[in-house]
């Protein structure tokens, strides 16, 4: 049996934008997500520029209590996954609940 992969929805949280519309607009208009580091003081390291996610609000996706139990990179993956889910138009039903799965390209490096 051949396994198939189907991409049903898109979501993104990245230095170029925290949603698909913003990210795509910045990409096609040549706006970079690279700038001076602001999340911490980089004076102790040689690199002072990076691609940081900016203006991201996890409370749009989960409660503050849930957010405190997760690392920031989990916030980004969760938000992108939820965006992709909404974009797909899929509905969870009793019949399909065990068949639905979400992933991102970064999860392979985390396991």
Q: Where in the sequence are the language-model features?
A:
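Conserved "HGTGT" condensation-loop signature of ketosynthase/thiolase-family condensing enzymes
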Residues: 1-103
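Single conserved hydrophobic/aromatic residue that forms the stacking wall/gate
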Residues: 101-111
